[in-house]
Structures are given as C-alpha cells and as structure tokens.
Curated annotation (Swiss-Prot):
Lineage of source species: Eukaryota, Metazoa, Chordata, Craniata, Vertebrata
Catalytic activity annotation: a ubiquinone + NADH + 5 H(+)(in) = a ubiquinol + NAD(+) + 4 H(+)(out)
Name of the protein in question: NADH-ubiquinone oxidoreductase chain 4L
Assembly and interaction partners: Core subunit of respiratory chain NADH dehydrogenase (Complex I) which is composed of 45 different subunits.
Membrane topology term: Multi-pass membrane protein
Single GO biological process annotation from the record: ATP synthesis coupled electron transport
Gene name of this polypeptide: MT-ND4L
Length: 98
C-alpha cells in the first residue's frame, strides 16, 4: 500500500470516527458523511487511473451523483428539523414520525 492509499484510507477512518463520536448534531454527522464520500471518490479515482480500468471510469461520477443526492436530502432534513425544533440534534429525528 503506497502512501497515497494510506492517507486516503486514514481520511476515511477519521471521517468514520468523527461520525461515531460526534453524532449528537445532524450538521456534524452530515459533514462526516461527506468526508467519507469524498475519500471514497478519491480512492476510486486513483485506483481506476493507476490500473487503467477504462470500463469503470464512470463509477466515481456515479458515486458523486449519489453523494450529491445524499447531501441534498440531508440538508433538507436539517432545515426541516431546525425550523421545527430550533436545534439540529439527532434525537429530534425520532419525533418526526407520521
């Protein structure tokens, strides 16, 4: 494993640890999820470029599309929770039952 892969893997692990440690606020959870998606995108792009996988060159773009959808849904949920309850605590999400 080269240093590039080790650093990207370390960024993913740090984002995962941040998600597990700072899960009380929705905004910090969303930022950690975005960090995880960004490190996955960079890891996939570097792997595809190093191994010359021409057939899998669209895979990082598809991952970015899913990351953008996840960010849009997360931010809309954040706006809804903060407008309704005034805070962005994750524990307020249990109250959003229909």
């Amino acid at each position: 494993m080269t240093m590039v892969y080790a650093n990207i893997f370390l960024a993913f692990i740090m984002s995962l640890m941040g998600l597990l440690m700072y899960r009380s606020h929705l905004m910090s959870s969303l930022l950690c999820l975005e960090g995880m998606m960004l490190s996955l995108f960079v890891m996939m792009t570097v792997t595809i470029l190093n191994n010359h996988f021409t057939l899998a060159s669209m895979t990082p773009i598809i991952l970015l599309v899913f990351a953008a959808c996840e960010a849009a849904l997360g931010l809309s949920l954040l706006v809804m929770v903060s407008n309704t309850y005034g805070t962005d605590y994750v524990q307020n999400l249990n109250l959003l039952q229909c």
